[in-house]
């Protein structure tokens, strides 16, 4: 009987976690030793629509880019915005939060976000051309491209490489 009740408890816990988690595609987080990138849907908090000026990363760092697919992007150095960095042997844990602060009322909401960098990582300039796609890779020589909107509206693509 005990294994059965334990299994039921896990099932209930999983159901609650799934219900509370909502849309898993609402947040995408990537990082390296030097930068932190987050891409969020404007409806991240319980399908409440956020304007770009109401969304913040960490200690009130504003949205850096609104993408054509209506997502908000944050692209900051990992030592800015109150991002907490913890080191465990060859692993780096970056922790911060996404905040919503309504401009029309006192409503606020927060969601913790974190990102892990393992082994050695490097960042180098690839090109001035934009690349698109949300393809994931699980190879050991991981290469993930990002687009950063620069001050002069040029798209600069960077790569995270871990070996």
UniProtKB/Swiss-Prot annotation:
GO terms for cellular component: extracellular region. Residues 1-21 form the signal peptide. InterPro entries: PLAC1_fam. Its main location: secreted. May be involved in cell differentiation. PANTHER family: OOCYTE-SECRETED PROTEIN 1, PLACENTA-SPECIFIC PROTEIN 1. This is Oocyte-secreted protein 1. The lineage of its organism: Eukaryota, Metazoa, Chordata, Craniata, Vertebrata.
């Amino acid at each position: 009987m005990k294994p059965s009740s334990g299994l039921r408890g896990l099932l209930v816990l999983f159901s609650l976690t799934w219900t509370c988690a909502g849309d898993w595609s609402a947040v995408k987080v990537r990082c390296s030793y030097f930068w932190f990138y987050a891409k969020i849907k404007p409806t991240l908090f319980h399908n409440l629509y956020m304007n770009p000026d109401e969304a913040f990363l960490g200690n009130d760092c504003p949205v850096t880019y609104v993408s054509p697919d209506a997502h908000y992007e944050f692209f900051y150095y990992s030592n800015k915005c109150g991002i907490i960095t913890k080191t465990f042997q060859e692993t780096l844990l970056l922790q911060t939060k996404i905040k919503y602060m309504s401009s029309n009322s006192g409503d606020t909401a927060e969601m913790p976000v974190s990102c892990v960098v393992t082994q050695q990582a490097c960042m180098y300039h690839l090109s001035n051309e934009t690349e698109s796609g949300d393809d994931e890779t699980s190879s050991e020589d991981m290469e993930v491209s990002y687009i950063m909107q620069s001050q002069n509206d040029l798209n600069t693509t960077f790569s995270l490489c871990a070996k």
